């Protein structure tokens, strides 16, 4: 009986050690614990980033600032704009907060009109799209949690000069597989 207990104990210790060993290799980098100020009208890294169509996007909270928990952009816009194709994220919730101007945002089959101070959450795996509908300057905060590869996605968007949904089937597949974004429809009309 004692030999059986010893074998069972050894088996259980080995079994319990497996998840600990797997998790040890997946530890995320801890945030620095240092506050980061990003001034109005500038990017976290002092970069000038542009969305397709020429509008600016400023990184306000970088992926590295939160060890991957959150990524935040500020997107000022000066013209009516249809926004990105209707899409969803496999792993990220997307949050929109209107600082200035008027926007329309669709989440699933719901349509929301945003004015300054309003916000909308687009849960992961739920199709969403947004458009700037105002007649003056607009400014929208767009956040992602967890951050995933969204910061990298914005860098690639700038290099490409167009959204993945406007490209070939291979472009759409790359967006889906690498960034976890699937385009499911056209942009909204402003």
Please give the residue ranges for each predicted region.
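N-terminal secretory signal peptides and thylakoid transit peptides that target proteins
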Residues: 1-19
């Amino acid at each position: 009986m004692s030999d059986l207990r010893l074998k069972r104990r050894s088996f259980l210790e080995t079994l319990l050690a497996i998840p600990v060993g797997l998790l040890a290799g997946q530890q995320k980098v801890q945030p620095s614990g240092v506050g980061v100020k990003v001034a109005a009208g500038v990017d976290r890294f002092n970069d000038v980033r542009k969305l397709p169509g020429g509008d600016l996007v400023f990184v306000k909270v970088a992926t590295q600032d939160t060890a991957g928990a959150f990524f935040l952009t500020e997107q000022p816009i000066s013209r009516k704009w249809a926004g990105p194709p209707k899409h969803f994220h496999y792993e990220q919730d997307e949050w929109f907060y209107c600082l200035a101007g008027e926007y329309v945002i669709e989440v699933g089959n719901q349509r929301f009109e945003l004015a300054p101070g309003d916000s909308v959450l687009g849960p992961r795996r739920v199709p969403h799209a947004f458009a700037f509908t105002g007649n003056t300057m607009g400014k929208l905060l767009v956040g992602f949690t967890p951050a995933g590869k969204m910061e990298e996605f914005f860098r690639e968007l700038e290099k490409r000069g167009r959204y993945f949904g406007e490209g070939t089937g291979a472009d759409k597949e790359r967006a889906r597989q690498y960034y976890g974004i699937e385009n499911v429809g056209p942009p909204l009309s402003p």
